[in-house]
Amino acid sequence: MEVYVPPPRVLAPTEGRNSISYNPLAPLQDTTHIYMIDNKTSDIQNMNIAKDHSNFFTNIIQNVDVAPSDAATQDIKLDSRSRWGGQLDTILKTNCPNVTEFFNSNSFKALLMSDKTDPTNPVFTWFELTIPEENYTLSSLIDMLNEAVVENYLEVGRQHGVEVSDIGVKFDTRNFKLGRDPVTTLVTPGAYTHKAFHPDVVLLPGCGVDFTNSRISNMLGIRKRAPYEPGFTILYDDLQGGNVPALLDLAKYPAQTVPLEVDENGLTYHVQEVAPKSWQTLYRSWCLAYQAGGKIKTTHVLTVPDITGGLGQVYWSLPDTFKAPVSFTNNTTDPATLPVVGMHLFPLSSRVVYNTTAVYSQLVEQMTNTTKVFNRFPKNAILMQPPYDTVQFISENVPYVADHGTQPLRNSLSGVQRVTLTDDRRRACPYIYKTLATVTPKVLSSATLQ
């Protein structure tokens, strides 16, 4: 009687197909953990002299009996008869301010009057205005933007006959239309409501702002409806229907119902009579134009301010650990082209803090601190410091824990592994503070017939 002999694959030993070998020690079966840690003491220092926490080399050999320099020359073998996968878990900590040159959030362009030597033919010039890198609240950011405009006036415009009332770009938080009488067309309280609402941009004729290469528009809650369309400028002519109403002159009321032409210092409000007994100022507000449903509403959209600037994503690359995903190549050492094995949002989050005494605190600060630089024109209803909002937006770096799933591993892992994190433009980021990763190998399938 012939004895049945099953195919060799059935009787082939399974022990060893899931073995993980490191020469100085006995093989492991089934699973282990591989740790990747930035700047730990067992790393070889001279390999990371010019590196940072987002692009570094780390030693994954944890043998305390072997010097780091020797352990780095060794490797970990995963049984070649099996296809291996690695469960990738990461922890990331950042210390990123919300206004930085690196992320294009500390500057914007403004079209301002630069020369009024000939009053009939003033000259307007585009200037790139920069504010210091810092972690700002929304109110402080608006103060700094206005200060940048005023500093430009003091440096350029004032030297060429430009008057204070010709400062044509103002960032504000008020709703200038509150209190407007529909019959007289004047703001009847004689003052604009001193309460913060949505961030706003106020312009004079010939002026504008350009956020093409700036994230500041995201912080102000002003965005394009077609975000991939090139360019992002806001010009005076775009703000049709957004003229700021004139104030009622209380000194002449009720004998006369006329607009207030100038402030206490003689600075004009640029009031114009558009019809008999109907006035408005030449100032135009982005928010008023948007709420009026004009042309600006078809191209722009009012959003919640993102005080982080709308930072994008973080890409993880471990080119010496994982096999390259489809469409990627391993024949590169450039961080911009390394294979990506993980992705998540940049861990800078916007937080909302409710402060019922925001304006009170602002007034106390003005009286007790030397902060007059933010309120250079307190008597001018347009150029005065805008009120702080009771809802404060702040940015916060939040440690981010991510599970990137199981991905195919190499069968041989060298003792030194490269870890690279890049931003949404595939650049190593200087604001990465701590980088941790754990890889858990496991067998996915057989790599041989037996």
From Swiss-Prot:
<dbReference type="GO" id="GO:0075509">
    <property type="term" value="P:endocytosis involved in viral entry into host cell"/>
</dbReference>
<comment type="similarity">
    <text>Belongs to the adenoviridae penton family.</text>
</comment>
<dbReference type="GO" id="GO:0039623">
    <property type="term" value="C:T=25 icosahedral viral capsid"/>
</dbReference>
<dbReference type="GO" id="GO:0019062">
    <property type="term" value="P:virion attachment to host cell"/>
</dbReference>
<dbReference type="GO" id="GO:0005198">
    <property type="term" value="F:structural molecule activity"/>
</dbReference>
<keyword id="KW-0167">Capsid protein</keyword>
<protein>
    <recommendedName>
        <fullName>Penton protein</fullName>
    </recommendedName>
</protein>
<dbReference type="GO" id="GO:0042025">
    <property type="term" value="C:host cell nucleus"/>
</dbReference>
<keyword id="KW-0946">Virion</keyword>
<keyword id="KW-1148">T=25 icosahedral capsid protein</keyword>
<keyword id="KW-0426">Late protein</keyword>
<keyword id="KW-1160">Virus entry into host cell</keyword>
<keyword id="KW-0945">Host-virus interaction</keyword>
<dbReference type="InterPro" id="IPR002605">
    <property type="entry name" value="Adeno_Penton_B"/>
</dbReference>
<comment type="subunit">
    <text>Interacts with the fiber protein (via N-terminal tail region). Interacts with the capsid vertex protein; this interaction binds the penton base to neighboring peripentonal hexons.</text>
</comment>
<keyword id="KW-1048">Host nucleus</keyword>
<keyword id="KW-1162">Viral penetration into host cytoplasm</keyword>
<comment type="function">
    <text>Major capsid protein that self-associates to form penton base pentamers, each in the shape of a pentagon, situated at the 12 vertices of the pseudo T=25 capsid. Involved in virus secondary attachment to host cell after initial attachment by the fiber protein, and in endocytosis of virions. As the virus enters the host cell, penton proteins are shed concomitant with virion acidification in the endosome.</text>
</comment>
<keyword id="KW-1164">Virus endocytosis by host</keyword>
<dbReference type="Pfam" id="PF01686">
    <property type="entry name" value="Adeno_Penton_B"/>
</dbReference>
<keyword id="KW-1161">Viral attachment to host cell</keyword>
